[in-house]
Amino acid sequence: MAQLYFRYGTMNSGKSIEILKVAYNYEEQGKPVVLLTSRLDDRDEVGYISSRIGMRRKAYPIGNDTDIFDYIDDISPRPYCVLIDEAQFLTRANVYDLARIVDELDIPVMAFGLKNDFQNNLFEGSKYLLLLSDKIEEIKTICHYCSRKATMVLRMEDGEPVYEGVQVQIGGHESYISVCRKHWFNPPRERIVPLKQN
């Protein structure tokens, strides 16, 4: 029986490499998958899932107006799994489409994304995935400043932490640092530096 999975983690926790690994494992067995990503994510190129280690795959870009259920229902032959990157950017309607794909088409759906934003609020997509998913799994990484588990994202502008502003600001190493709760509230000022670019 198919299930809806939500695998969440902070920035730089390996979500994109995990989605590419899952796709590879299915396809190695001759089982086609569908890769989806947010139309908002243009860090590399719209319509691609890219990992920090250099792997990338083409994916269908979805937006607020995309009927994901109809898109998947029209694919023949049916995919064995639907994989979604940047799932935090999904809308409530998008997430309900994913639940319908699982329940009505009996296709497993795995959504990967951030849980909370830089203000420590849930993203809309993450909120509804937490409510509707059959399985919720955390992809872990460590704090930029210590060895604790990173659970939050710190937005940086000109070397300073930012706690106010628009929720969605597409960025990577230059804009966001994964931190533990302690260092989200009190980042060590003398050690605030953006992550190195590869």
Swiss-Prot record:
It is found in: Cytoplasm. InterPro entries: P-loop_NTPase, Thymidine_kinase, Thymidine_kinase_CS. Pfam families: TK. Keywords: ATP-binding, Cytoplasm, DNA synthesis, Kinase, Metal-binding, Nucleotide-binding, Transferase, Zinc. The active site is at 86 (proton acceptor). PROSITE patterns: TK_CELLULAR_TYPE. SUPFAM superfamilies: Glucocorticoid receptor-like (DNA-binding domain), P-loop containing nucleoside triphosphate hydrolases. Its main location: cytoplasm. One of its GO terms (molecular function) is thymidine kinase activity. One of its GO terms (biological process) is thymidine metabolic process. ATP binds at residues 9-16, 85-88. The keyword Cytoplasm applies. GO terms for cellular component: cytosol. Its EC number is 2.7.1.21. It comes from the Bacteria. Zn(2+) binds at residues 143, 146, 180, 183. It catalyses: thymidine + ATP = dTMP + ADP + H(+). HAMAP family: Thymidine_kinase. Homotetramer. PANTHER family: THYMIDINE KINASE (PTHR11441), THYMIDINE KINASE, CYTOSOLIC (PTHR11441:SF0). Belongs to the thymidine kinase family. This is Thymidine kinase. It comes from Streptococcus thermophilus (strain ATCC BAA-250 / LMG 18311).
